[in-house]
Amino acid sequence: SLPMKKDSINFSNIFSPNFMLRYAPGHMRNLSKNDQNFNYSDLYALNKTTEIETGLSAVLGFDYTINEKVNNKIVKEKFSASLGQVFNHERNKDIPSKSSLDQKMSDVVGNFKYNFSQIGTIDYKFSLDHNLNDLNYNEISTNLNFGKVEFNLDYLEENNHIGTEHYASSGISLNFNDYNKLSFSTKKNFKTDSTELYNLSYQYSIDCLTAGLVYRREFYQDSDLEPNNTLMFTISFVPFASVDTAFNQ
């Protein structure tokens, strides 16, 4: 029977193959130039773009999850993997080409997620060309919490019809106590092989008041231009309003 399930003392594994057949008559307006991505979260939607796509199509995919159990009860999702593809009866030039849904076979889209128990998660999203040779979209994001230290990392690479973005950003925060927090973040642009910015901030929070000091150094692609330095003082009254004062150099 489906979905297929396998249980052990500590884990429950579930594999769910998915199939959907749809047909929408009529004619849709031309969206071919729209900036429209396609990922796994859109796979089974009736309208994968801003409108319902006309024509006959089929969706084939699967979901696989590993759930952690305690006392024979599922307490959290440890790992998940999802994969799928759209098959169209014929090409539709009115659908955004960036989405690959205008082709007879769309990109193979997927998502993987792993839960590191108490410290955080890592997510991987991708879009593989239907020829299975070209990786058109590649995104990795992770958030880890080690108590007083928090770390995050994001990596994005776009190729071919999806785009040209290629960068990595990371940040680290040090929580001295419940009131004081120091954070640092940076972003690297691999297209230009340059660092785009640095952010250094200090934040003090107590009750409904949050005050902070932020230093930002932003670099330009033109090497003849000096980096832009900004020092900003922020104060927020939760949940009312915030005041920002910036000093540029």
Residue ranges and their predicted role:
Residues 1-249:
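Outer-membrane beta-barrel translocator/pore domains, especially the C-terminal barrels
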